Amino acid sequence: MTIHCITPNPAIDVTYTVDTVVLQKVNRVREVAHRPGGKGVNVARLADAHGSAPVATYGFLGGTEGVLFKELLDQLAPGIDQRWTEAEAQTRRTIAVVDSADTTMLNESGAPVPQSLWEQLIANLTAHLASKDWVTISGSLPPQTDPTIFADIVAAIHDAGARVLIDTSGPALWAAARAGADILTPNRD
């Protein structure tokens, strides 16, 4: 059995630590941290750390940010098989500004993903699926993505005899539910 983790809209998570955020002033950053992010990547890292089954990741990465993302994930979890689909657009970033009292998040929305790249992702995924495998699809969709793409992915997974867990919200969650996803974990994000 292999655990396949799809992150539709991955991001490099950047955390800036400051003493105190003062609006409309220069804030000196004490510490900067970069890590590969996205709900599906977090699932993959946890599954890899558990060590009970091989883990593979899928999604869309592009540009120099995509290269950095792969390097960061390799450093944190070298056992994960990275099977990303290459996109033209830069991989997005999320920014967290942390001080002693609060955290402020700035999340880029990411770039639209053409249908042809979704088809590549599905072909890449199904080429690696076996009947006892599990697939997780976790997180938000890139902008302008038809939420019924999750129904297409669920159907392809079931056609291969594998099972699927969906962790998302809104119309994408409903599309996956109507397509017969095996497990749904609705969320508000």
Question: PLM features: residue spans?
Answer:
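Short beta-strand segments
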Residues: 5-8, 59-60, 85-87, 96-98, ...
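Positively charged, low-complexity intrinsically disordered leader regions
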Residues: 1-24
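Substrate-binding N-lobe of the ribokinase-like
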Residues: 28-90
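Glycine/charged-rich beta-loop-alpha catalytic/anionic-binding loops adjacent to active sites
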Residues: 22-31, 105
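Conserved beta-alpha-beta core of the PfkB/ribokinase-like small-molecule kinase fold
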Residues: 134-189
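Hydrophobic/aromatic residues located in beta-strands of well-ordered beta-sheets
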Residues: 3, 55-57, 164
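Conserved phosphate-binding/catalytic loop of the ribokinase/pfkB sugar-kinase fold
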Residues: 86, 96-131
